[in-house]
Amino acid sequence: MNLKNLRKKNKKELNNELLNLLREQFNLRMQAGNGQLQHTHLLKEVRKNLAYVKMLINEEKKGRNNNG
């Protein structure tokens, strides 16, 4: 997921992306707990993408729209 592409999305799309990432993180954690997860790097990638989306949502809430 690219930060530039995320910045182009509106608030509703960001919230949908957040829900999708949270579901994906939950599924990956369940797979890891059962010993079925083979690609452990996906957990880190999803966590990073969650942080990006949350950061952009908070920027919009605070009225900052940094386009750079």
Swiss-Prot record:
What species is given as this protein's source? Wigglesworthia glossinidia brevipalpis
Protein name stated in the entry: Large ribosomal subunit protein uL29
- Choose one Gene Ontology CC annotation of this protein and give it: ribonucleoprotein complex
**Which family does the record assign?**
Belongs to the universal ribosomal protein uL29 family.
Which molecular-function annotation in GO is an example for this chain?
structural constituent of ribosome
Query: TM spans, by residue?
Result: none
Name any Gene Ontology BP term.
translation
**Per its UniProt record, what Pfam families does this chain match?**
Ribosomal_L29
